A protein has these predicted regions:
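Conserved alpha-helical scaffold segments that buttress catalytic/binding sites
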Residues: 1-206
Length: 206
């Protein structure tokens, strides 16, 4: 599903995957922010899975979404509360900020870490938040006006990641934070989908 924001292109995809899965569900999420506030800050309504809390709402609503099978990639924003991130880490989440990707793992090393989403799971949900590009990738530096942070993921890195995910398989995926009128980002999403499909095809030919 390709959409502009949450919950229509995040929680709304995670929910049916969880409801239809016979076992545990892993998640691979690329993002600049954790989107894991305890409550939606725009409405203050605990029922809402909004842009800032859809991920925490997913894990609190569906017991088969497994935090030890969460692979969280790309965050480097300074808007997060440390207690929120530490809570996920203490519960077994696998976190790869862009600093770690660039200074230690590289894209090849990062792709190896995708295994955590698949270990012991029956399904995997993949979420591409395109604000991960802001500040370095092909998206405008002021992606959606305010979401850019330094050390963004490059177009090659996100395409390579999608290709490797395709080789491993997935149940469903979604895109959000697509800059309106950004033709290069639109094209990048087409590349992500195409290279992911190529990965699926390669896995089935082996």
């Amino acid at each position: 599903v390709v959409g502009q924001n949450s919950p229509c292109s995040s929680y709304a995809i995670a929910k049916p995957i969880a409801e239809r899965s016979a076992g545990k569900v892993g998640m691979i999420s690329t993002d600049t922010h954790w989107d894991s506030r305890p409550i939606d800050y725009l409405t203050g309504d605990e029922r809402i899975a909004g842009s800032g809390n859809w991920k925490s709402k997913t894990f609190s609503s569906f017991a088969n979404f497994s935090i030890p099978n969460l692979v969280e990639i790309g965050e480097r924003g300074m808007l997060e509360e440390a207690s929120v991130v530490r809570n996920y880490m203490q519960r077994g989440a696998h976190f790869y900020p862009m600093w770690k990707v660039r200074s230690e793992l590289g894209i090849a090393g990062l792709c190896k870490e995708l295994r955590h989403a698949y270990e012991g799971t029956d399904d995997v949900y993949v979420h591409f938040d395109m604000d991960i590009l802001g500040g370095a990738g092909p998206a405008p530096g002021d992606i959606l006006g305010e979401l850019a942070e330094p050390m963004g993921m490059s177009d090659y890195e996100i395409i390579r990641l999608a290709h490797e995910i395709g080789k491993r398989g997935l149940t469903g995926m979604s895109f959000i934070c697509i800059p309106p009128g950004s033709m290069v980002t639109y094209r990048l999403i087409v590349y992500i989908i195409a290279f992911l499909i190529a990965g699926l095809a390669l896995s089935r030919s082996d």
